[in-house]
Curated annotation (Swiss-Prot):
Pfam families linked to this entry: Metalloenzyme
Annotated positions binding Mn(2+) 2: D298, H303, H351
Name of encoding gene: deoB
Cofactor binding comment, as recorded: Binds 2 manganese ions.
Protein name: Phosphopentomutase
Keywords: Cytoplasm, Isomerase, Manganese, Metal-binding
Species in which this protein is naturally found: Streptococcus mutans serotype c (strain ATCC 700610 / UA159)
UniProt-listed InterPro entries: Alkaline_phosphatase_core_sf, DeoB, Metalloenzyme, Phosphopentomutase_DeoB_cap_sf
UniProt entry tagged with the keyword Translocase: no
Protein's cellular compartments: Cytoplasm
GO-annotated biological processes: 2-deoxyribose 1-phosphate catabolic process; 5-phosphoribose 1-diphosphate biosynthetic process; metabolic compound salvage; nucleotide metabolic process
Native organism taxonomy: Bacteria, Bacillati, Bacillota, Bacilli, Lactobacillales
Binding site for Mn(2+) 1: D13, D339, H340
Pathway(s): Carbohydrate degradation; 2-deoxy-D-ribose 1-phosphate degradation; D-glyceraldehyde 3-phosphate and acetaldehyde from 2-deoxy-alpha-D-ribose 1-phosphate: step 1/2
Entry GO MF terms: magnesium ion binding; manganese ion binding; phosphopentomutase activity
Gene Ontology CC: cytosol
Length: 403
């Protein structure tokens, strides 16, 4: 059995690898998710060239149909498989929480027709600002500011919208509604959405800048999540004195629970990789766990159904992967996975219920291969097993298979 001093987990947000067994219980624009396949459809429709992930074994992951442009390796450098989600949801928070060892048996509340008047009126009363009612529905984050940003600049009204996820999002032009005011309003919205019938996973502050027809969302986004309902492996590690480092929106997703070092938000995937590499180089980081989320795949290309952009984003990450590997120590373990799918060729604009890939690499490996198909929480079980903390949670460790 290998024991690693450091484990680095990188979540490629929404990079699914084929419909999950229960995918037809989920849908997009009325179309069941049963034919979704993020990586497969990208590879088939626009081509996919990711030689560095392929070298680890991406093309060796078991599939009914091999990835068209990602060949299997005869001698991969790592271990690979695909993982199934058991929780009742396909959103970011559910996926990440399950990866860290929780099973979400009751999904969060979603509002396909917008938020009820009771919630909107409370926010208006608290903020002293009106809410643009026409925006109160599932909306693309970029489209909603294109459509209502000019009006907000004139009136100072709030743009409140949702998505297929259990989220309430408030968009505000930074020159009209200052950040501290936006954050204060979001904190209030969080306080009134903590229980059913409005149990939301996240409240998201969505600041933006610019002029009409040229608005840009800024890096001052802030997520107000729920704390996990039970201890995750992050808490187990922190309680045992094992350092945990969060890169990107990980700290927000877990509401800071179990995070000992928040390395900040990412401005882009590339910036997130820079931050991860910087984190790996910290002199104090001799033992512990880093957890990185790279969200551009999902936020910029999956929801917008932009297969070419999604492919290019995967290419960009793959080009940076050797830098991550170069920053590893011999007793490090790198795990690359995803939290759900978001097939850019599929119906609708929502996430897709898919298996996610798992790639495992360490400079210390003497073997390679395909691991049994598992579940998201196998990752948390493996991390717990490696650091010798309580594993009384869902998931099965694959640590003893990494040689």
């Amino acid at each position: 059995m290998s024991t690693f001093n450091r484990i680095h987990l990188v979540v490629l947000d929404s990079v699914g690898i084929g419909a999950a067994p229960d995918a037809n219980n989920f849908s997009n624009a009325g179309v069941p998710d049963g034919a979704s396949d993020t990586l497969g459809h990208i590879s088939k429709t626009v081509g996919l060239n990711v030689p560095n992930m392929a070298k680890i074994g991406l093309g060796n992951i078991p599939r009914d149909t091999p990835l068209k442009t990602v060949p299997a390796e005869n001698h991969p450098t790592g271990y690979v498989t695909k993982l199934e989600e058991v929780s009742l949801g396909k959103d970011t928070m559910t996926g990440h929480w399950e990866i860290m060892g929780l099973n979400i048996t009751e999904p969060f509340d979603t509002f396909w027709n917008g938020f009820p008047e009771e919630i909107i009126s409370k926010i208006e009363k608290f903020s002293g600002r009106k809410v643009i009612r026409e925006a109160n529905k599932p909306y693309s984050g970029t489209a909603v500011i294109d459509d209502f940003g000019p009006r907000q600049m004139e009136t100072g009204e709030l743009i409140i919208y949702t998505s297929a996820d259990p989220v309430l999002q408030i968009a505000a032009h930074e020159d009209v509604i200052p950040l501290d005011e936006l954050y204060r309003i979001c904190e209030y919205a969080r306080s009134i959405t903590l229980e059913r019938p409005a149990l939301l996973g996240r409240i998201i502050a969505r600041p933006y800048v610019g002029k009409p027809r040229n608005f840009t969302r800024t890096a001052n986004r802030h997520d107000y999540a729920l704390s996990p309902f039970a201890p995750t492996v992050l808490n187990k590690l922190a309680d045992a004195g094992v350092s945990t480092y969060a890169v990107g929106k990980i700290n927000d997703i877990f509401n800071g629970s179990g995070i000992t070092n928040d390395m900040g938000h990412n401005k882009s995937n590339s910036h997130g990789v820079d931050t991860l590499i910087k984190t790996m180089g910290l002199s104090a980081f001799t033992k512990g766990f880093s957890f990185t989320n790279l969200v551009d795949f999902d936020a910029l290309y999956g929801h917008r159904r932009n297969a070419h952009g999604y492919r290019d984003c995967l290419h960009e990450f793959d080009e940076r992967l050797p830098e991550i590997i170069a920053a590893m120590k011999v007793d490090d373990l790198l795990l690359i996975t995803a939290d759900h799918g978001n097939d850019p060729t599929y119906a609708g604009t929502d996430h897709t219920r898919e298996y996610v890939p798992l790639l495992a690499y360490s400079p210390s490996f003497t073997g390679n291969g395909v691991l049994p198909v598992g579940h998201y929480a196998d990752i948390s079980a493996t991390i717990a097993d490696n650091f010798g903390v309580d594993t009384a949670m869902i998931g099965e460790s694959f640590l003893d298979k990494l040689i």
